[in-house]
């Protein structure tokens, strides 16, 4: 008699013999393991046959299968516990599935149900994070959520995702994961390994507390933040916890509940690269963390970390090694400014050349200031995502300043000094202008909630909390006042120009020229307001009196609130020269090759 399973061949014995008739060594065709089969006749003399499977040397506990006659479906499975084959436990089963379960093997003759990954169509390994998926998509989704990675699509955000092309566009792959039902909160709630204790930067919070903001997908109203703290919260040394999770209500949410930010394809093409430098700094920070923790070997082939780091160093090298040919034009040459008035030197005193702008200081291209947020947006945002959004705003502001012909004419050294002196004011104006896009009120509410809990647990000093809370209050007041005045794009552009060309910062050279540009910006703002809002006599005065409030906000606190979670101990001042030296083509080149 031959067993129906192809894995083990069992040979029967003559039923007239009551003692073991045959001992045969067979090999499991799948595992290659050798098994000993002893064939015997049941002591009662019935036709039942007993097949004893033990190790080849006859030692150790074996499995005994007592097979009934072909007319019966009953089967007995006996586990022996001694050398004399006295059964230690007998379990009677009547269905093949139970036999398979007890034997620890599957019936290969029974057709197996094969499930396929709903994302890429590969063979699924089970249900992961709420959707049937393969190990590849499971790992990709987990890494994307755990590391809060942001991707961009080189096409129109509708790339084909299948088994063979799933690695070509990570943006569309993550988008499809969300569309097919994978839940980010399922990844966040997973238990972290106990033996992995990563050292955090000294100026970042070490707490494991999390902030959740409940969101009604059908309501555009700002949600109310609620605080959840882990039991083992550790000592906090900075303002924000890198593990803090924030759910930010976005004005545009698809009806099917998919949490994706609506993006303008043209804006993504022209401005999407502005987030590249944030990714560059993030890549360098991630590299440092990986090397410090010795976990570089854990990186998967699907991760783009290695290539991102390579591109990061290449980009920074290009910025540092910029040749003289890439420097701004000489003051003696007229700058052809498609984005503003022409620049001409009207005095050739080598010590203090005077530059005159023919035409407007700013053009319509400088009025456009559209921030593209990282997408897709995770349902629970953490500090890294907030810092990534803030860094895009900072880079957009610097890109805007660099495009002004009058700014270019001042030279690279003066450009760096000006931006270092006023980046906090430019950034704050950008926050006010993009407050709705960034859901700034919700972000600030979550931060306040987090800080309130920190002071209750004595993680931050009272004086430090007071400084930060005052800073947040000033920031919120400024943004609210600008929203109340309903400042338009032209007015924001001229206010930024007035702030940019401020001659009263310590250490500036050529202050007379800078002051001349500031006066021109003020005059053009006055002309615009009088022409556009002729009925509002005091509008210009109400706008200008808001500028002193910008000087009251600490750049150090702004840096720690919005950037420390991304760049660690790297200061904004040290990054500014690299940003100003980099060309727009380099930004776009980074984005074009960002997706693997």
UniProtKB/Swiss-Prot annotation:
What are the GO MF terms of this UniProt record?
A: DNA-binding transcription activator activity, RNA polymerase II-specific; DNA-binding transcription factor activity; nuclear receptor activity; RNA polymerase II cis-regulatory region sequence-specific DNA binding; RNA polymerase II transcription regulatory region sequence-specific DNA binding; sequence-specific DNA binding; sequence-specific double-stranded DNA binding; zinc ion binding
Pfam families this protein is in? Answer: Hormone_recep, zf-C4
Asked if the record carries the keyword Zinc-finger, the reply is yes
N6-acetyllysine found at: 231
For this record, the Gene Ontology CC terms, alphabetical, are:
nucleus
- Per the database record, which ranges form the NR LBD domain? 341-583
Keyword Magnesium among record annotations: no
The chain's disulfide connectivity reads none
User: What are the coiled-coil residue ranges?
Assistant: none
Query: Taxonomically, which superkingdom?
Result: Eukaryota
Per the record, the zinc finger regions (NR C4-type) lie at 117-137, 153-177
What are the protein's UniProt keywords? Acetylation, Activator, Differentiation, DNA-binding, Isopeptide bond, Metal-binding, Nucleus, Phosphoprotein, Receptor, Repressor, Spermatogenesis, Transcription, Transcription regulation, Ubl conjugation, Zinc, Zinc-finger
Question: Quaternary structure per UniProt?
Answer: Homodimer; can bind DNA as homodimer. Heterodimer; binds DNA as a heterodimer with NR2C1 required for chromatin remodeling and for binding to promoter regions such as globin DR1 repeats. Interacts with NR2C2AP; the interaction represses selective NR2C2-mediated transcriptional activity. Interacts with PCAF; the interaction preferentially occurs on the non-phosphorylated form and induces NR2C2-mediated transactivation activity and does not require the ligand-binding domain. Interacts (MAPK-mediated phosphorylated form) with NRIP1; the interaction promotes repression of NR2C2-mediated activity.
- Protein's UniProt name: Nuclear receptor subfamily 2 group C member 2
Say which species the protein is native to.
Answer: Rattus norvegicus
